[in-house]
């Protein structure tokens, strides 16, 4: 959703920092919402039309996760995030803002990176994973394994309910 909670305004500023630091990256935002026009305007003002892409609502987000080296979940507040769980399932290295819901799903430095919700912290976390492929691989693998644990927990709960 393109709304205030998701902090895409801050994400756009983080992408500008990444580009200005000389990195080539693409950031896809899926979905629709009330902030689309203001976000598109900001992207254009910062010259990020080729780097920050908003294809709109898609019926299947998994191809986007699958091609992503890094999944970024920078939100102002969050409950349990299905998007984080989907990214873990597909083994994405995750960068997420350090808020309650995200903190419950990610162990910083192990299966993802938690950062402050500001452009510098987000950009620095992303750049650290771009620069350190081994760190990115380890985080990605830990995220994938965490999903296996989730599946085991769900199976156990279903068995207990029968």
Descriptions of predicted regions:
Residues 114, 134-161:
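A charged, aromatic-enriched C-terminal amphipathic alpha-helix characteristic of glycosyltransferases
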Residues 57, 76:
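Aromatic "clamp/platform" in nucleotide-sugar-dependent glycosyltransferases that forms part
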Residues 1-17, 23, 34-40, 82:
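A conserved mid-protein helix/loop that constitutes part of the nucleotide-sugar donor-binding site
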Residues 11-15, 27, 122, 157:
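A structural motif in glycosyltransferase catalytic domains
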Residues 86, 99-109, 113-114:
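Short acidic/histidine- and often glycine-rich active-site loop of Leloir-type glycosyltransferases
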């Amino acid at each position: 959703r393109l709304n205030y909670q998701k902090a895409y305004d801050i994400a756009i500023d983080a992408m500008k920092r990444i580009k200005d630091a000389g990195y080539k990256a693409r950031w896809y935002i899926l979905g629709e919402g009330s902030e689309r026009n203001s976000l598109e305007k900001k992207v254009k003002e910062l010259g990020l039309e080729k780097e920050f892409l908003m294809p709109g609502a898609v019926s299947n987000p998994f191809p986007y996760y699958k091609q992503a080296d890094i999944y970024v979940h920078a939100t102002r507040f969050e409950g349990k995030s299905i998007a984080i769980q989907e990214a873990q399932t597909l083994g994405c290295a995750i960068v997420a803002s350090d808020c309650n819901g995200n903190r419950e799903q990610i162990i910083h430095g192990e299966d993802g990176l938690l950062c402050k919700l500001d452009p510098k912290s987000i950009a620095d976390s992303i750049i650290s994973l771009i620069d350190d492929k081994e760190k990115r691989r380890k985080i990605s693998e830990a995220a994938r394994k965490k999903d296996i644990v989730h599946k085991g927990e769900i199976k156990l709960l279903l068995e207990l309910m029968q």
